[in-house]
Amino acid sequence: MDYVTTINTEHSTYSATDPKRTLIRMTRGRLVAGWIYFPSGPAGHLHMTVLRAAYQVAPIDPQQGYALDDAVVTLAPGFDLHQPPYQLTILTWNTSTLYDHTLTISLTLDPFFGKPPKRPFLSSLFPSLRKNKVEL
């Protein structure tokens, strides 16, 4: 399942100490991949971090954040969302005094991770194999 969110962060409104908070609500499963797209234009003014509950998960070092221009950051989180709330919080702030800036984040979640696959029994695919109906 893919979750895509576009976040516009207004200039002179949010800061590192008071960032914009955007929730990405998902379902139970494992986050297996994702990417963050910074279009050309922010020139390092648009900053972003990803939180899971109170913990920063991207970038993993809480002293760092993403602030890029015309770049795609590939994510390979590989962690499970097995307890509610099934969501991530995206923190963004814009240090530009003139322009709003936008980024796009996409996350791929495998809702079936850890569950045995549902496979039909052979007898449902081949009626002649059903009990008491085998013909030789």
Task: Pin down the residues of each PLM region.
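Beta-strand-centric surfaces of beta-sandwich/beta-rich domains
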Residues: 1-28, 35-136
